Amino acid sequence: MSTPEPVLAGPGILLVLDGWGSADAADDNALSLARTPVLDELVAQHPSTLAEASGEAVGLLPGTVGNSEIGHMVIGAGRPLPYDSLLVQQAIDSGALRSHPRLDAVLNEVAATSGALHLIGLCSDGQIHAHVEHLSELLAAAATHQVERVFIHAITDGRDVADHTGEAYLTRVAELAAAAGTGQIATVIGRGYAMDKAGDLDLTERAVALVADGRGSPADSAHSAVHSSERGDEWVPASVLTEAGDARVADGDAVLWFNFRSDRIQQFADRLHEHLTASGRTVNMVSLAQYDTRTAIPALVKRADASGGLADELQEAGLRSVRIAETEKFEHVTYYINGRDATVRDGEEHVRITGEGKADYVAHPHMNLDRVTDAVVEAAGRVDVDLVIANLANIDVVGHTGNLAATVTACEATDAAVDQILQAARNSGRWVVAVGDHGNAERMTKQAPDGSVRPYGGHTTNPVPLVIVPNRTDTPAPTLPGTATLADVAPTILHLLGHKPGPAMTGRPLL
C-alpha cells in the first residue's frame, strides 16, 4: 500500500516575506527581537529549510547581497539569472565594454565636437543599483578617446550602504578620476531626489534642474555638499560644485547613465530627456545596462533572457493567478517575477494596494499591511484562483530606514498578517509556500569605514527561510532538503499545483 502524499496537488499561496533573512539572535536582529510566535512556529513546526538568496546562487557576483528584484526574478524563473551587475562586470573583465561600438561612437563624437560627457549615477558599492568602481572603466574609456570635459553627476546613497559614508565614496570617485586623468565631480544630490520611483516628480525635478540647468546650492567641494544635508546621504540637497565651472548638459553633449538597475533611475532619465528635448538640446544618451524607460535609451550591456519561468508555465497550463502587493513591491510580484515582462497574461489578475500621501515608514511601520492581508484572504477564498502570489513588504521597506524599533514593529505586524493568511489557507484547503527574497531585518547595524558601528538599512548575504505548509494534516510532514536556493521555488510551486517544472528551470521541487 502506497504512502499518501503529504501535500495534495491543488491551489495554494506563494507568500514572499520581503527582507526575511535568517541569522542568530543579536542586539541588532529585528526579527529575533520582535515577538513573532507565528513565524517562529511556521519554521519550527512545518517542513522548512534555508534557501540561498545572494551571490552566485541567484546570478550575482560572489559575496554580493541579494535584492528584491533578482530575488523575485529567480523565484519566478526557476533558475539563477545572470543579473545586470554580473553582466556588466563580465563585460568589463573581457574588455567588451571598453571596445563596445556604441560607446566608441558616443565618445568619438563628443571628442570631435569638443562636447562634454556627463556620467550620472549612484556613487557607492552597495551593488544593488550601481557600483562606484564601474566608473573606472568609463573614465578610462573617455581618456582613451581624449574626451577633455567629463562631468560626474554624483548621487549619494545612504540606503544600500551605511548612512554618512557619502564623503568616503565621493573621495573614491575623485581618486578614480585622478587615476584616469579625466573627470571631475560637477554636482551632488541624494538618491531620495534622483532615484524616486513612486512618481513624485517634485523630487525628480530637483535632480533634472540640477544636471540640466545647474540649479542648486553652490558648494566649494563634494564633501561640503554632503555635509550640508541634515537628513543623511539619501537626502543631500541639490548641490553645484563651483570648482567644476559650467557643467550643465549642453546641446551636442553625451549623457551616460551608470546605474545598472533600471527601476530607480528611469524616472530621472525620462524626465531629463524630456526636459532637454523641450529646451532644444540634442543629447546623445546611453545607459550602462538596459533600462525600462519610455525614452529609447541604447544600452551597452543587454539583460539575460528570463523566459520559460513560472508565468509561462502557469499560462500554458491554463492556471489562474492573483498577484497582490502594495505599491512599493507591486512590480516584484508582477513585472519581476514574470521575468521583467510587464504584459498581463491570460489568467493573471493584478491587485495593487495603494497608500495615501508620502510614506513615513518609521511613523507608520504597518504601511498598508491590513489591506494587503484582506486582499490575500479574499483571493484565497475564491474557487477560480489556482495560485495567490503576495508580497508582504514591511520587514524590508521599514528595515531600509535603519530604525531598529520601527523594524521590530514591522516584523510583529507581519507576524499577525501571516497568522490571518494561514487561517485563510486552512479554510480554503490551500497549501502555502512562505519564503524570503533576501535578508535585511536580521542585521540592522554595520561597521562604517571609520570603524564606528552605525545603523544599517541595507540587504545581507544571509540565507532566507523557506517553509511549506501542507494542505493536509492526516499524513506525516515531509522533510525538505537541508539546502536550497530561490531557484527551487518555482519548480516546487508547479509540483504542488500538479505540474512538472518547465524545461528552462534548473531548480528542483523540494518535495
From Swiss-Prot:
- List GO terms (cellular component aspect): cytosol
Q: Which residues bind substrate?
A: 129, 159-160, 191, 197, 261-264, 329
> Which keywords annotate this record?
Glycolysis, Isomerase, Manganese, Metal-binding
Region Disordered: list its residue ranges.
Answer: 442-464
Q: Where does Mn(2+) 2 bind?
A: 18, 68, 437-438
Q: What are the required cofactors?
A: Mn(2+)
Q: What detail does the entry give on cofactor binding?
A: Binds 2 manganese ions per subunit.
Q: What is its EC number?
A: 5.4.2.12
Query: Where do the annotations place Mn(2+) 1 binding?
Result: 396, 400, 459
Sorted alphabetically, which CDD domains does this protein's record hold? iPGM (cd16010)
* Pfam families given in the database record: iPGM_N (PF06415), Metalloenzyme (PF01676)
Pathway stated in the Swiss-Prot or TrEMBL entry? Carbohydrate degradation; glycolysis; pyruvate from D-glyceraldehyde 3-phosphate: step 3/5
Entry-linked Gene3D superfamilies: Alkaline Phosphatase, subunit A (3.40.720.10), BPG-independent phosphoglycerate mutase, domain B (3.40.1450.10)
The record places the active site at 68 (phosphoserine intermediate)
| Keyword Isomerase set for record | yes
Reaction(s) the record says it catalyses: (2R)-2-phosphoglycerate = (2R)-3-phosphoglycerate
The entry lists its GO molecular-function terms as: manganese ion binding; phosphoglycerate mutase activity
Any GO BP: glycolytic process
Protein family per UniProt? Belongs to the BPG-independent phosphoglycerate mutase family.
Tell me, in a sentence or two, what this protein's role is. Catalyzes the interconversion of 2-phosphoglycerate and 3-phosphoglycerate.
How does the record describe its quaternary structure?
Answer: Monomer.
Cross-referenced NCBIfam families: pgm_bpd_ind
Name of the protein in question: 2,3-bisphosphoglycerate-independent phosphoglycerate mutase
Species, as recorded: Streptomyces coelicolor (strain ATCC BAA-471 / A3(2) / M145)
Q: Tell me what gene encodes this.
A: gpmI
